[in-house]
Amino acid sequence: MSEIGERVKKIVVEHLGVEPEKVVDGASFIDDLGADSLDTVELVMAFEEEFGCEIPDDAAETILTVGDATKFLEKNAKS
């Protein structure tokens, strides 16, 4: 997993309280990790803060899995 992927995983574990081994690229935030819509909004805000970038609403709607978040942030992260 990339350095950005590891940071994404850490945020997901902290915010959703899931076991680290469940946080894999194909894991759906809602279906696999038990997030609700508020959790997903909070995750997006945490990603924005951690990586110093803005995630527009239309992009946030396409970030459904851990891998989606990692790919988006690898392209758009400022830090």
Swiss-Prot record:
Pfam families xrefs: PP-binding
Tree of life domain: Bacteria
Post-translational modification: 4'-phosphopantetheine is transferred from CoA to a specific serine of apo-ACP by AcpS. This modification is essential for activity because fatty acids are bound in thioester linkage to the sulfhydryl of the prosthetic group.
One GO BP annotation of this record: lipid A biosynthetic process
Location(s) in or outside the cell: Cytoplasm
GO cellular component, one term: cytosol
Role played: Carrier of the growing fatty acid chain in fatty acid biosynthesis.
Family the UniProt entry places it in: Belongs to the acyl carrier protein (ACP) family.
Name the record gives this protein: Acyl carrier protein
Gene: acpP
